[in-house]
Amino acid sequence: MRQNIHSVKAKNIKIGTRDSELALWQAHTVAKQLNDLGHETEIIAVKSQGDILLDKPLYELGITGIFTKTLDIAMINGQIDIAVHSMKDVPTALPTGMMQAAVLKRANEKDIMVYNNNLDFLDAEGTIATGSLRRQAMWLSKYPNHRVVDLRGNVNTRLQKLKDNDWHGAIFAAAGLERLGFINNGNVIKSPSFVGAGKALDWMIPSPAQGAMVIHAMQRDEYSKNAVAELNDLETDICTYIERQFLKTLEGGCTAPIGALAAFADDKISFKGILLSIDGKQKIEVDKIVPIQEWKKLGYNLAQEILNNGGIELMSTIKNSLKK
């Protein structure tokens, strides 16, 4: 049973975050919301392994929680009280004693392609940059004649790399660009390092929980978890739960080519999910609308549908490919 926050001794809530511009934006957003509710906060930034190890694709590093582990350790050691994450980066299993304390209202869940000149390359041969296996697989499934190159780093770094190379475009999470104020008038991308255009990829099924921010706290920390609970958005909480349950059932971790999107539709929930081979040549999809009361096992049930439709073999192939 959750204690009344006024019955627990107040404290300055130490907010842990990665030190990238986007992560700091997220942490300051949480701090402001907590401040508005009367809580005192302090932001503590750390550098994650994922921000340091930039010379290899994420899937080759083989590190679970590469963007979250440093903050997990800081929280367990009492250096921070809560941690703010992009939810799509969070492993489906949390460390012992840690809990998901709140999910903030979801922003734009879509992917967007940022490009330099024009879109003529879409009908010819092209080179697209992304560090995501899901984006790579979905792009190659739609554009099999294209080449995909690896792209790592924070948002500004990736935009700079796009400017410096002869790639035709690069794929980003739209929410990140919007949060940093880099999208103007719908499709103009403008940052300190890049000016170009963007095209929303409405056909691309996003990463589970893309566009959502999550806050973790220790289960024993009554004050912090109760304070943060006031920020929870129930609709986003339910939708991301379904998507991550789908991911966990497929055993995809954060790097396999898996997409999932749940959304409320009146008194129903719509769900789209996909599992692809790394080269995009194979894919298994589900697309369902179900009564809202079925949400608790929806992700599991639809993942089982994919597994029973060739997904077991495809997941085995993917895992073997990633081991090479």
Identify the residue ranges that each predicted region occupies:
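Short glycine-rich anion-binding loops that position phosphate/pyrophosphate groups of nucleotides
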Residues: 87-90, 175-177
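Paired acidic/hydrophobic, glycine-rich loop segments that form the ligand-binding mouth/hinge
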Residues: 64, 81-86, 168-173
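Short, structured active-site "lid" loops
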Residues: 55-82
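Small-molecule-sensing regulatory modules
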Residues: 2-54, 60, 136, 143-324
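Structured loop/turn residues at beta-strand edges in well-structured enzyme cores
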Residues: 78, 124, 165
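A conserved helix-loop-strand patch within extracytoplasmic ligand-binding domains
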Residues: 87-88, 96-149, 198
